[in-house]
Regions:
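Active-site rim helix/loop that mediates acceptor-substrate recognition in acyltransferases
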Residues: 21-43, 152-174
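Conserved GNAT acetyl-CoA-binding A-motif
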Residues: 87-98, 222-234
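Recognition helices and adjacent regulatory flanks at domain boundaries
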Residues: 26-27, 171-177, 183-188, 205-221, ...
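Short amphipathic alpha-helix that is part of the acyltransferase structural core
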Residues: 1-29, 125-158
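Conserved acetyl-CoA-binding loop-helix of GNAT-fold acetyltransferases
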Residues: 73-86, 201, 207-221, 241-246
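Conserved active-site alpha-helix within GNAT-family acetyltransferase domains
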Residues: 79, 98-115, 212, 235-253
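Conserved donor-binding loop and adjoining core beta-sheet/short helix segment
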Residues: 28-86, 180-195, 200-203
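Acyl-donor-binding surface of acyltransferase catalytic domains
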Residues: 59-63, 69-132, 258-260
């Protein structure tokens, strides 16, 4: 007999335990792109009676970006998943291919889908790219005006940028007094030591190998300082995929968007 299941909106901070269980259930961490969306989305408890058995997180655009159930309810996951879709008016779903529960639920419903991002979660070797005679230094507070005027492509506030600089997570390639590029790491979640890599190259200096060398620098930096790193890029960003692969990153997974 299927138990009575209900869905109840909740303040995320009131039930962080369910999210922690979800993160532990996955073989890999998700990137900062999704973590940022989670902070701006609606959190829903999934209940059996008055017992919390899982949760869903839905963006303001009605996209499901997280779905979790306790193991003892996996046998009725398709029923609960359909209930979530109907009750929360879900129009699309972001699913990481290493999230077997959500992937299976989506495939069972024969949804249309497309691959939207390539996810890099493994390193095959120490980067072979040499960075001799390639000047890289830590960003400092007095670099803020320059960075704020140049980094239009980075979705980052002044406060977020200052935080990365203070933690020594932001690095610059400046040559002949010109900012050619920068690379940085962001801690994906406060409770886990996992770092997402970001990069920016000045449009005037692109296609000159700067991005490859910046990635080599930051990957080596993370390895030397025991900072586990992950990365991802749009499926059509072939250039970035080649750079990551050249620097030893391996992609075994993707982010899929299922559409209803």
């Amino acid at each position: 007999m299927i138990p009575q299941i209900s869905i109840q909106q909740e303040d995320y901070k009131q039930n962080e335990l369910s999210r922690i269980k979800y993160i532990y259930s996955l073989p890999h961490f998700q990137e900062q792109l999704l973590e940022i969306q989670i902070g701006e989305s609606n959190f829903y408890n999934i209940l059996s009676g008055d017992i919390i058995i899982g949760h869903s997180i839905v963006t303001k655009e009605n996209r499901l970006i997280e779905f979790y159930l306790e193991d003892q309810y996996i046998s009725i996951c398709n029923y609960i998943f359909a209930l979530v879709i109907f009750d929360l008016n879900i129009t699309s779903i972001y699913c990481k291919t290493y999230n077997s529960l959500l992937l299976n639920c989506c495939l069972q419903l024969n949804m249309k889908y497309e691959v939207v991002r390539t996810l890099f979660r493994d390193l095959s070797k120490t980067p072979a790219v040499t960075i001799n005679d390639f000047p890289v230094r830590s960003a400092e507070k007095n670099d803020l005006p320059l960075l704020l005027s140049c980094l239009n492509d980075i979705n980052m506030t002044k406060e977020e940028l200052e935080k990365l600089i203070n933690k020594n997570y932001f690095f610059l390639n400046i040559d002949n007094n010109e900012l050619k590029g920068c690379v940085y790491i962001c801690k994906v979640h406060d409770n886990w030591d996992v770092y997402d890599i970001g990069i920016w190259v000045n449009p005037e200096f692109r296609n000159r190998g700067i991005a490859t060398k910046l990635f080599s620098f930051i990957i080596n930096h993370c390895m030397e300082n025991n900072l586990p790193s992950i990365c991802g890029c749009a499926i059509d960003n072939i250039a970035s995929q080649k750079i990551l692969t050249k620097n030893g990153f391996v992609s075994k997974h993707s982010l899929i968007e299922f559409k209803l």
